[in-house]
Amino acid sequence: MLKIIAKIFGSKHEKDIKKIQPIVDRINEIYGTLNALPDEAFRNKGVELRKKVRDKLIPFETKIKETEHKLERPDMSHEEHEKLNIELEQLRNKYEEATAAILDEVLPETFALVKETCRRLKGHTYTVMGHEMVWDMVPYDVQLIGGIVLHQGKIAEMATGEGKTLVSTLPVFLNALTGRGVHVVTVNEYLAQRDMEWMRPVYEYHGLSTGVILAGLYSNQRRNAYLCDITWGTNSEFGFDYLRDNMAGSEEEMVQRDFYFAIVDEVDSVLIDEARTPLIISGPVPNSDTDTKYREIKPWIEQLVRAQQNLVATLLDQAEKTLKEKPNDFDAGLALLRVKRGQPKNKRFIKMLSQPGIGKLVQSVENEYLKDNSSRMHEVDDELFYAVDEKANTIDLTEKGREFLGKLSHQDQDLFLLPDVGSEIAAIEADKNLQPTDKIRKKDEVYRLYSERSDSLHTIGQLLKAYTLFAKDDEYVVQNGQVMIVDEFTGRVLAGRRYSDGLHQAIEAKENVKIEGETQTMATITIQNYFRLYSKLAGMTGTAETEASEFFEIYKLDVVVIPTNHPIARHDQDDLVYKTRREKYNAIVNKVQELNAKGQPVLVGTASVEVSETLSRMLRAKRIQHNVLNAKQHAREAEIVAMAGQKGAVTIATNMAGRGTDIKLGPGVREMGGLFILGSERHESRRIDRQLRGRAGRQGDPGESIFYVSLEDDLMRLFGSDRVIAVMDKLGHEEGDVIEHSMITKSIERAQKKVEEQNFAIRKRLLEYDDVMNQQREVIYTRRRKALKMGRLKNDIMDLLQDYCYTVAKKFHESNDPAGLEEQVLRELSVEFHVEASAFEREPFEQTAEALYKAASEFYHRKENSLPDEIMQQIEKYAVLSVIDQKWREHLREIDSLREGINLRAYGQKDPLLEYKQEAYKLFVELLREIEHETLSVAFRLFPVSQDESEEIEARQRRQAVRQERLVAQHAEAESTYKIAADGGMNATLWMPGDEIVVQQPVRTEKKPGRNDDCPCGSGKKYKNCCGANE
């Protein structure tokens, strides 16, 4: 029905192109007039366009700066502040509207200018990544259409070989005229550097500056790159710079400008494939004993896994024996279902599933236990030591498994019993027979026991995942004594990336390599929320249409399919389906041998290192020369890809040969039918399959593509084989037989769609959780940036003081404790405040608060008069920044802990997301209270020290510098890791050229409390966890 409607009214993409066509006609009209202009007059055109755009925007920028400056006035009332904030927001909106209007106005002339520039550069030679390249590109009409789509803030889907890199020059040049900076985001640093060097002549011809962000650059180099009109870099480099800017100790250390316009190359890879893994800057966990912990528990897990394997073997024996006598026996089906739940990748089990009727039997038994919301599934799992859910990527330890591990640990079931901390602490407090010291000791024991057991349970869970869900040469490889993650979408080794939450350490223990130390989160943001910072976002890729709904729902990005310059001549064949992998591999090798005999180049796409090496061994046995491109051979990637289109070439590649590469056909290959693409299995994402097909048939070249599939492939086994198995059973297929039908291909695509929907749900859920943190992050980072950019922060300090005075006065009035009030004010503010006990009882707390505010204000005023204004400014900034950084780190740790356990609330019929929002809000309110309290305390107690004490301060700063360098930037699951540059990142130590800063402690007249004593402030916490935390 939809196809009939599209034929009558035209498709969405046809309508999109129809709207753009008049602009393309106008561009070409102007382009025809530029040819006759001499070089100088032509260059002046670019200068004139830039001046026209800037003249329109400068008045808005001036007004915005004036308003921002007014907001910094220390004597402003709250009402004036709110009014100016609204005015500023309106100004910024008008600024964005004016920017869009002027750029739309000059678009035809600018695009024509870029096109003519490309024509004038033809024949010129440039060095790109060390190679000489002759410029031979002038944008076609379809490329002009792509450029317009990108400028409009949409995603342009363009087929392989259609020149996406050249297309980007058009909107990049146009938007760079604003002077606000344009970011071009690539999937790796090689492409960032290459594209910058390749396209730079177009920009430099008209005086636009270019820069690139690479790992390892120092802060000043990064800042200079961001100050350029156009900046290239990877999504992780841009994201980490944003996080580091919000950890900076001074405004001079920040490197980024405002977020105006970003064009994301391979947008589906960046915004979808990478979106499940948040960017994290982390630091080492002090006193972490990771190695011992994992080494100690590893033997238990190995014994548990062996016990499960033996159990599975027994179940398979029972099922095989029973099925010989009773082909459709329910108990045999139940045994096989237990095998599926206990060891789903068992080769013997997978082979059994290809036998007639077996798959159907297992499915029918599983459906029986899945009735009533899976209420009976525990009956299946209870016989196992643990249950594996491959689809959800989770493992559930059963009661039988817990008993097994309990005996190995000599703790029986106690290992899995976490003490109820709240009730046990309350019981200790209520026990009148215990002395205060005994209470402290018993409380410590409860906390220690809880910490040890929860830590052990976490380690057990991660080791079990490492042994059952993560396979060497599939999810990761081991190289040079290190566990290296393999990107499932590109097949590339992700150098330096690490799995989070202790999983990487568990895999390191499994593979007997060095176990790296654990880390804690210092700053984090998801890819989705980072790119939402930009005023305008656009992207380009060869494969976006299948994810159009996700792009719109998450990023509000429309997808427009750009027509090709030449019709696609590639022939895409229906899939060939075999029963077993062995049959499929034999068929692939035979097909490669057939193609190689006539000289037609063939690219064999695989989903893992293991499969590529298996096929390579089989081809070697047939004496067929070939190249292998996988995570272990990536160093020769450019050389191998360059040769893949030559006559007689045979290339086996994981998904690596997909992005940023063009395979050009050698002499005589077109006549043979072009490049032949042979997929060894379907990927779980249709986009990756389309990327592989797209290697052939570029720019109208001939080509062919086909996928070979078996029922043992993970995708078919998990999501799509039921109908296909039924068809094969009915047709009575024998070994070696193959099914080829469009119905089968459609069935496989439906299976892929299921996986895509599941992955979308995961990414969407991640975003819903991170939206909570995003709101909190914005509040904290806004406070931090304000503190960095403003001069004196006295007004803010005085506001905090007023709140503090009323809070403590009310608290101690309620308990009628004037001595407690005096002691707390002395300890927290270093202010001596005295109040008569009789007057304290008579007066309302407001009067005490006013007296306290007056005394504290006078103390602060005396401090101001005794110190230069510059030093007071640094004291106030240090108070705000150091407290925000410390408390925000602690808050992130608490949020991590909350996230880890929040899903358990579902067992209590509660929505984990709703519970998470409520709990996170409570934690955030407490965080803000603590930040305000601590900031005030530090601002009052911070004083310059004498020269005699400066050596100790310098030593502390050196220790901090060492800790600072140990911070790393990484994805939660996997992203680039490298040391922070020495002159970048957080500067939590206040540096003064002449003086040093230290917190002045009040003079004590009573005995100092011990580390484990109750804190004298009355908080109920131990001294070491409260006022003594920094000692």
From Swiss-Prot:
GO molecular function: ATP binding; metal ion binding; protein-exporting ATPase activity
Ranges that cross the membrane: none
Cofactor dependence: Zn(2+)
Recorded topology in the membrane: Peripheral membrane protein
GO cellular component: cell envelope Sec protein transport complex; cytosol; plasma membrane
Family, similarity comment: Belongs to the SecA family.
HAMAP family xref list: SecA (MF_01382)
Role of this protein: Part of the Sec protein translocase complex. Interacts with the SecYEG preprotein conducting channel. Has a central role in coupling the hydrolysis of ATP to the transfer of proteins into and across the cell membrane, serving as an ATP-driven molecular motor driving the stepwise translocation of polypeptide chains across the membrane.
Protein name (record): Protein translocase subunit SecA
Gene name of the record: secA
